[in-house]
């Protein structure tokens, strides 16, 4: 049972939450696809896959099909940040499909549930609690 860290971005609040969960139900899904948040414990939420990283630290790229590692000539992010105008460099990146060896998956909330994310994760009453 491969586990992954899900980094859940909440566009309303601008906060991110880390959740460790099984990524087996998402194997085969691609960047941009929407899935039910129930898979990672966010009941009622719809989440969109935005990217990720494999166990070696190579980033996923939406324009490379499949789940393989490839060395490609890049001129823009993700996977390469040019220092000078027009700079290109050959870098190793992953494809846009989730595989069992993906250890971090970045997701964004596209549809909200009834309860807030901190409430579902048991974080409610931590830093904003009045004394």
UniProtKB/Swiss-Prot annotation:
GO CC, sorted alphabetically, is: ribonucleoprotein complex; ribosome
Classification via Pfam families: Ribosomal_S6e
Q: Which PROSITE patterns match?
A: RIBOSOMAL_S6E (PS00578)
Q: Show the stretches that span the lipid bilayer.
A: none
One BP term from GO? translation
Region of interest (Disordered), residue spans: 76-95
The entry's keywords: Ribonucleoprotein, Ribosomal protein
- Compositionally biased spans, kind Basic residues: 81-93
Asked whether the keyword Transferase is assigned, the reply is: no
Q: Does the keyword Ribonucleoprotein apply?
A: yes
| Similarity annotation | Belongs to the eukaryotic ribosomal protein eS6 family.
- What name does the UniProt record give this protein? Small ribosomal subunit protein eS6
> What organism is this sequence from?
Methanocaldococcus jannaschii (strain ATCC 43067 / DSM 2661 / JAL-1 / JCM 10045 / NBRC 100440) (Methanococcus jannaschii)
């Amino acid at each position: 049972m491969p586990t992954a860290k899900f980094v859940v971005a909440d566009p309303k609040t601008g906060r991110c939450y880390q959740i460790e969960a099984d990524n087996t139900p998402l194997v085969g899904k691609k960047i941009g696809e929407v899935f039910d948040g129930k898979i990672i414990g966010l009941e009622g939420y719809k989440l969109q896959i935005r990217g990720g990283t494999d166990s070696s630290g190579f980033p996923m790229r939406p324009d490379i099909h499949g789940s393989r590692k490839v060395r490609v000539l890049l001129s823009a992010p993700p996977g390469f940040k040019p220092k000078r105008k027009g700079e290109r460099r050959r870098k190793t990146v992953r494809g846009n499909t989730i595989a069992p060896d993906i250890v971090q998956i970045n997701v964004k909330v596209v549809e909200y549930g009834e309860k807030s994310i901190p409430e579902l994760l048991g974080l409610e009453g931590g830093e904003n609690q009045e004394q």
